[in-house]
Amino acid sequence: GEATQHQILKTNIRPRKVTRIFISHTHGDHIFGLPGFLSSRSFQGDGGPLTIYGPAGIEQFVQTSLKVSRTRVSYPIKYVVLKEDGLIFENNLFAVYTARLDHRVPSFGFRVVEKPRPGELLMDKVAEYNVPNGPLLGQLKAGKTITLSDGQKLDGRDFLGKERPGRVVTIIYDTRPTENIGKLADHADVLVHESTFNGDEEKMAHRYFHSTCLDAARIARDRHVRKLYLTHISARYTGKAGKELEHEARKIFKHTRLANDLDSFEITLRG
């Protein structure tokens, strides 16, 4: 969004630590802050390569902005153009999926899925083998095979409880209600959903390819989401009017909050 490089200064996030950026669509309020952020990242020293995921046109926008402003970045930028629904990134910690939404320009939602966590270490079972505290216990907890002082080998996987599912965060920006939102939001721990209008403005929301707070709440309810955060609120809803959107959505889905810049929320593991 706009002024990203200014807001990020108020957090403990360092631009050079950011290695991937996901852009939903190319409307100005979602990309005008990108050139400034890229420049700030360069000023802070070499942060290494950066990958930008976004719809067609995002590379042209960035390169033109940097060229016209004669801004030189000190690191390579790779562009991944979003075209098809599905997996777009994966490492050993999490995976990111995308699906096309319904907006005036190509727009995409994102589902971030954390990899499953190892189960809890079964200490009663560990005690039977007199495993000492220290590195060996840590390796066992990580599911690795260890060798005791008497030569006996223990497979860490035999000492762990049931694997715990990772957390899921779904981010939905500019769109009208569409089936793909449900697919991305299904059983998410957190759903961040655009809420440009209140429930009384359903026709206007449809005309301008946006959603209401009630649209977001219905998705959260029907797709068994744990928590819903409303964002992308129209400027007409300031102060108490903004809180009214939250109150309205809670009538359908009680675990709803209005998101503000710099808010911080903990996402707990299930179970």
Which residues does each predicted region cover?
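Active-site neighborhood of phospho(di)ester-bond hydrolases with catalytic His/Asp-centered motifs
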Residues: 19-26, 54-55, 170-175, 192-194, ...
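Binuclear metal-ion centers of metallo-dependent hydrolases, dominated by the metallo-beta-lactamase
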Residues: 85, 178-271
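Hydrophobic packing residues within well-ordered alpha-helices of enzyme cores
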Residues: 8, 34-37, 62-65, 181, ...
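Short, surface-exposed amphipathic charged segments that create phosphate/polyanion-binding patches used
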Residues: 89-98, 269-271
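Generic structural signal for residues in well-ordered beta-strands
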Residues: 77-79, 96, 256-258
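Active-site metal-binding motif and surrounding structural segment of the metallo-beta-lactamase
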Residues: 2-53, 81
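Active-site-proximal loop/helix segment associated with metal-binding centers of metalloenzymes
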Residues: 93-171, 175-184, 190-192
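Active-site neighborhood of divalent metal-dependent phosphoester bond hydrolases
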Residues: 46-83, 236
